[in-house]
């Protein structure tokens, strides 16, 4: 292309602010300058240094090719190295820092920032003389970001505190929030959790800094540290502030969409050929700023997507911490929804058991039965089978007694509605008792040597005594059928049961039942192994057999 045409096209592109398309023309000027002594390419560069990084960034914005960021950073550093006194040197160093951070070259970026903030160099003095406080604040922010990313807590401690001081002076809440998030993470990682608490009120504000992935992971770890020390209330504060990986992903996905939409709207204005140069320059700076925000948001999203989900661990920690602080209802619902929303999790058995046990703690019988039945229905779950069956049986027993009491209270009712209610309560009571005995019998048949066998025998004995169904107790425990003992029936005649811990209880309850029905001689062989003495004609205190409520209380205990 002829030199005159080349310069004309280049001037036209530069005037329109289209620096990206102007870059090939500069390359051609370099080639032309090798043969034409009238073309001084170096003077062209010195006269318009901002064109080159701006052109590279426009190319990056169009293609998202990160090599353009690298080229932009290299140009800025090279130019300032040659011309440190150039009027645009500070601006170019600031741009170099921005590009290096976009390219995630944190060590190189922080060196540039430290150079700009060094009181011994002219750069800082010039910035302060010109009163560019916002530029200084951005430098402090950049330095903090670099040390935070590098996890350099020694230098970071100074950088974070200085950023917080400067941000507070400028009343910049976003930058102050970021400084606080950095300090919080530093204190947790270095196990100085107590120093986090003065910062907590400021961490509750909705800013991008709150959605930093590492900050939230460390908040959870800080809560774990406090929980291990028994400081449950303080741990709950950190757990409450922790964002999950999914929340971080959603936030940055929405943020990327918002920034992209804003860039698209801005690009429409940038295409207007009639914009004044000053206005065009302002819009291009804003577009570059949005490009950096977009790159940062995408970087955060990438980190969140690579981070293994810790939602389950967080929810478990919250629920168990509620339990430790005796907030039992919150603990129950925490465990309950943890299981319900992820029933296929490899830890589902632990989830459902925790929810089941919590339901029993708060005496939520309906949920206790619901969860217990679901646990027992899964034949692969064996870890807590004994505990669940024991608690379930007791829950059915209590509910059956409750329904029986309702039915008894309405026996003399006259209204049809009350009579129907009494009938339903009676039927419910019978169904609950039926399920209670099924669980007890199944457990004792399967594992008569288990420590819980005593509980099942005592619970059944309690029910039989309250209902005065001694014949049924004797048939089940001692093998009495129609008043005649059968050596092939009854728990006490089962060798496996006889060797287990529940044998004394079964003998005692069977013996007392025989006494209650007037069969004193038949009761003696059953009671003798328990008291250790066999005395013929053993006198019984008056009222021992008649006061059944007293016997029932003993059995319950």
Task: Give residue spans per PLM region.
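Acidic, polar-rich low-complexity tracts and alpha-helical solenoid repeat scaffolds
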Residues: 1-557
């Amino acid at each position: 292309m002829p030199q005159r045409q080349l310069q004309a096209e280049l001037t036209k592109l530069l005037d329109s602010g289209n620096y990206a398309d102007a870059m090939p023309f500069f390359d051609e000027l370099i080639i032309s300058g090798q043969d034409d002594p009238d073309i001084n390419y170096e003077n062209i560069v010195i006269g318009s240094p901002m064109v080159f990084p701006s052109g590279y960034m426009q190319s990056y914005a169009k293609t998202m090719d990160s090599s353009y960021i690298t080229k932009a950073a290299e140009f800025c550093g090279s130019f300032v190295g040659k011309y440190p006194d150039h009027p645009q040197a500070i601006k170019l160093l600031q741009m170099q820092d921005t590009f290096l951070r976009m390219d995630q070259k944190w060590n190189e970026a922080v060196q540039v920032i430290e150079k700009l903030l060094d009181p011994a160099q002219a750069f800082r003095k010039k910035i302060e003389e010109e009163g560019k406080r916002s530029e200084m604040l951005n430098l402090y922010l950049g330095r903090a970001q670099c040390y935070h990313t590098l996890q350099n807590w020694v230098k970071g401690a100074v950088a974070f505190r200085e950023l917080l001081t400067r941000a507070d002076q400028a009343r910049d809440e976003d930058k102050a929030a970021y400084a606080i998030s950095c300090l919080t993470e530093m204190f947790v990682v270095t196990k100085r959790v107590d120093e986090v608490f003065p910062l907590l009120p400021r961490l509750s504000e909705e800013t991008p800094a709150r959605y930093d992935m590492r900050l939230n992971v460390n908040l959870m770890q800080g809560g774990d540290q406090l929980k291990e020390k028994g400081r449950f209330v303080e741990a709950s504060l950190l757990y409450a502030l922790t964002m999950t990986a999914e929340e971080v992903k959603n936030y940055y996905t929405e943020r990327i969409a918002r920034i992209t939409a804003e860039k698209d709207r801005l690009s429409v204005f940038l295409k207007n050929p009639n914009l004044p140069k000053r206005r065009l320059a302002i819009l291009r700076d804003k577009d570059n700023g949005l490009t950096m925000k977009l790159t940062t948001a995408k970087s955060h999203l990438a980190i969140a997507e690579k981070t293994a989900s810790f939602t389950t661990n967080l929810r478990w920690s919250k629920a168990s911490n509620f339990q430790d602080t005796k907030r039992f209802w919150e603990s129950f619902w925490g465990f309950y929804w943890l299981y319900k929303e992820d029933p296929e999790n490899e830890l589902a058995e632990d989830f459902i058991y925790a929810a089941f046990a919590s339901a029993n703690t708060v005496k939520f019988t309906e949920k206790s039965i619901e969860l217990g039945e679901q646990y027992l229905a899964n034949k692969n779950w064996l870890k807590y089978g004994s505990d669940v069956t024991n608690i379930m049986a007791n829950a059915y027993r209590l509910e059956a007694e409750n329904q029986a009491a309702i039915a008894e209270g309405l026996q003399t009712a006259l209204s049809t509605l009350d009579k129907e209610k009494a009938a339903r309560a009676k039927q419910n009571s019978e169904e609950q008792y039926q399920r209670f005995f099924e669980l007890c019998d199944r457990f004792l048949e399967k594992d008569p040597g288990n420590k819980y066998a005593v509980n099942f025998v005592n619970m059944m004995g309690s029910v039989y005594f309250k209902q005065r169904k001694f014949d049924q107790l004797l048939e089940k425990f001692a093998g009495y059928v129609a008043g005649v003992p059968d050596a092939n029936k009854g728990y006490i005649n089962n060798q496996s049961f006889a060797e287990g811990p529940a044998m004394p209880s079964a003998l005692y309850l069977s013996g007392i039942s025989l006494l209650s029905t007037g069969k004193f001689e038949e009761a003696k062989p059953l009671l003798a192994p328990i008291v250790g003495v066999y005395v013929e004609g053993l006198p019984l205190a008056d009222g021992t057999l008649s006061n059944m409520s007293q016997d029932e209380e003993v059995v319950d205990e």
